[in-house]
Amino acid sequence: GLDVVKDYKQIRQQVGYMPGRFSLYQDLTVEENLDFFATVFHTTIRENYDLVKDIYQQIEPFRKRRAGALSGGMKQKLALSCALIHKPEILFLDEPTTGVDPVSRKEFWEMLRHLKDQGITILVSTPIMDEARQCDRIAFINEGEIQGIDVPERILQRFSHILCPPGLERTEVHAGNDFAIEVDQLTKCFG
């Protein structure tokens, strides 16, 4: 293992991080943000283009636009490109789809599957259970403590009393890869 104090430079090269509030420089253009993050990691966009190509091609038409003028979905793609620019082995994503429209959210999860297929380990924090279901394993955290780690279906079964408390009716709707829970009488529990 690595020591987080002594080996921080090596760890920084191996880890990509995308915070929930995208850490982009709003006054810089798309291209300038990517160049900046590449420089921080002693690389270039060209050197690691193969990893970000599929994502970058979607934002390339906006490369001269300031990040602050992008839509939520475009900011998300730019932030992901910046987190990947140095080819990390592990990618940490903190609530990556918060505030993003449903179409961009779906596209984002498709991008994550593609990155996983390329061998990148991805850790995602999300309060959205249909997103958690797309993961191979879930660490279910309740009131600040890990309650269990398992595959999504077993976590949902084991903690259904927390995820859907007694007296709260729900209907699960499955349509292909999409998943939704319709909850009745929500104000009864949360007033």
Question: Regions from the language model: what does each represent?
Answer:
Residues R66-L70:
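Conserved ABC ATPase signature
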Residues I149-D150:
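ABC ATPase "signature
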Residues K87:
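Conserved catalytic motifs of ABC-family nucleotide-binding domains
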Residues L80:
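Hydrophobic anchor residue at the start of the ABC signature
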Residues L91-D94:
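Catalytic Walker B motif of ABC-type/P-loop ATPase nucleotide-binding domains
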